[in-house]
UniProtKB/Swiss-Prot annotation:
Subunit structure: Monomer.
Task of the protein: Has antibacterial activity against Gram-negative bacterium E.coli ATCC 11229. Shows hemagglutinating activity. Inhibits prolyl endopeptidase, but not trypsin, chymotrypsin, V8 protease and proteinase K. May have a role in mucosal defense against microbes by interacting directly with their membranes.
Keywords: Antibiotic, Antimicrobial, Disulfide bond, Protease inhibitor, Secreted
Naturally occurring in which organism (per UniProt): Phyllomedusa sauvagei
Residues in the signal sequence: none
Protein name: Proteinase inhibitor PSKP-1
Length: 58
């Protein structure tokens, strides 16, 4: 399990590159930044704890 490096994306637009990550919530995210945006925008406490399960699609 990998901690996403969300600090890299603070106040920036997500890059358009497709580099899928599989979250510990078993969802595939477009890239690490997209996962970080989801975590930041979510109001659910459980979502704040999502990590990267693996690089690539779930």
């Amino acid at each position: 399990v990998i901690e996403p490096k969300c600090y890299k994306y603070e106040g920036k637009k997500c890059p358009p590159d497709i580099n899928p990550v599989c979250g510990t919530d078993k969802r595939t995210y477009y890239n690490e930044c997209a996962l970080c945006v989801f975590i930041r925008q979510s109001t659910k406490k459980a979502d704040k704890a999502i990590k990267i399960k693996k690089w690539g699609k779930c």
